[in-house]
Amino acid sequence: MNYQRPKGTADILPGQSERWQQVEAVARKIFAQYQYHEIRTPIFENVDVFSRSAGDTSDIVTKEMYTFKDKGDRMMALRPEGTAGVVRAYVENKLYGPEHAKPYKVYYLGPMFRYERPQSGRQRQFHQIGVEAFGSDSPVLDAETLALAKQLLEALGAKHLKFVINSLGDPATRKAFHAALVDYLTPFKDQLSEDSKVRLVKNPLRILDSKDKHDQEIVANAPSILDYLTPEAQQHFDRVKTLLQGLGIPFEVDATMVRGLDYYNHTIFEVMSDDKVFGGGYTTILAGGRYNGLVEELGGPETPGIGFAMGVERLMLLMQGELPTAQPDAYIVTIDQGADQEALQMLTAIRQQGFTGEMDYMGRKPKGQFKAANKANAKLVLTIGESERAAGTVQIKNMATGDQQAFPQADVLADFGKIYTQVMEAK
């Protein structure tokens, strides 16, 4: 039987994984500049963590979650997104306590799981990098979060970016808009998709996010939530826009944007790209917003929050250029089998001194070893044969210049760095 990876998954192979490591390293560095610290949560949670946070009418909960019963007959789900698990951890570990900094800032990275139709940049197991900040409802934090998103994407080389924002207001806003939206949609009830007929009763805002083309035609003339913002919600949104303008972050306001998760309120945003790799049109590569109320929903005290998540697979499509391959600093060639012990001791010492190195493990003849060193693009080749062992020396060749000279093995073992600098800088 030929075993294949599950549909909608990918093997991240050497040559590809280095790019992922590069993205993660850049993200970690920038997050540290903003005082975010890493959090790692389980890849599966009690299913209620997601149904209570994302909303039981959301597509994620109704159609896309991978669920299973454990041996204790508890219903579990592979995490479809990162925020809910982080909020659960925030509440369970009492990270809202007075001993913790406020706002409490964390970031995460790792795999998520949704049962979707696989396509370019969209997998059933996919990866996200995200941030969450708890404890402040200041519009300044909203603006900082968008500034962080912009800095991160630009540092990763993303281009053709468009920032789109909206406000979903506060509970009073949502209540007034809910009533207006139901009044507008009710005459179209029989024309709505089956999913949206259910949403009309349970959560009509979800209809604004419908992927059904006929639903989209109906909601095109729906009321705007921006017309129902309370004075407090309007003031918050106006302040966010002013701050973004002051930061030089261009943005568009899209009153129909609601995001796919029920926990959002006040400021929400998406960052899109129309890069040609997406086949035309704008594709979302980062999105997030405020979720004041979500901590309480999962059993914690009243705590505002804001965050975003970035899809790594989609970002990878924007980073198709070749990465420089990692060159080993040293490759050790053995002329005879008896040199294996000295070679291994020397290679171990070189690595322990912070350098990269390799040797032959395939029993190749010297000619084959030199070919392997060339293929690996080694900077230096160290050769040990019978005469070198007898003299306690090693031949070291600079592969770029072809220069070669002998050094005592003891010097390599004691201070390879000094020899490396001398050989690499020799004219």
Swiss-Prot record:
GO biological process terms held by the UniProt record: histidyl-tRNA aminoacylation
A Pfam family that the UniProt record links to this protein: tRNA-synt_His
Molecular function GO labels: ATP binding; catalytic activity, acting on a protein; histidine-tRNA ligase activity; transferase activity
Catalysis: reaction(s): tRNA(His) + L-histidine + ATP = L-histidyl-tRNA(His) + AMP + diphosphate + H(+)
UniProt key word Isomerase: no
Uppermost EC category: ligase
Keywords, sorted A to Z: Aminoacyl-tRNA synthetase, ATP-binding, Cytoplasm, Ligase, Nucleotide-binding, Protein biosynthesis
EC number(s) stated in the UniProt entry for this protein: 6.1.1.21
Gene3D superfamilies assigned to the protein according to its UniProt record, in alphabetical order: Anticodon-binding domain, Bira Bifunctional Protein, Domain 2
PROSITE patterns reported in the protein's UniProt record: AA_TRNA_LIGASE_II
Subcellular location(s) per record: Cytoplasm
InterPro entries, A to Z: aa-tRNA-synth_II, aa-tRNA-synth_II/BPL/LPL, Anticodon-bd, Anticodon-bd_dom_sf, His-tRNA-ligase, HisRS-like_core, HisRS/HisZ, HisRS_anticodon
Protein family according to the UniProt entry: Belongs to the class-II aminoacyl-tRNA synthetase family.
HAMAP family, per the entry: His_tRNA_synth
Quaternary structure (record): Homodimer.
Protein's name in the database: Histidine--tRNA ligase
Species in which this protein is naturally found: Lacticaseibacillus paracasei (strain ATCC 334 / BCRC 17002 / CCUG 31169 / CIP 107868 / KCTC 3260 / NRRL B-441)
Phylogenetic placement of the source organism: Bacteria, Bacillati, Bacillota, Bacilli, Lactobacillales
